[in-house]
Amino acid sequence: EMTLICTADDGTEVRLRTEAMNDSEGKLVTSDDLLGKNIDIRGIVDYYAGNYQIKVFSYKHILFNN
């Protein structure tokens, strides 16, 4: 699992938490794979460690825009 702090288009910080995920080639996805990328996600609103976040369960729920 990993938690990423992302910035929405309006400047709002959004916490994104993922389960351990593999990409389409079976490689483990790390924060380096998402760093600096513009993404759209599909997940659920969750509460973890005192913060609301969006939890993503599958790599296919992350759409890369760049």
Describe the residue ranges of each PLM region:
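OB-fold single-stranded nucleic acid-binding module
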Residues: 1-66
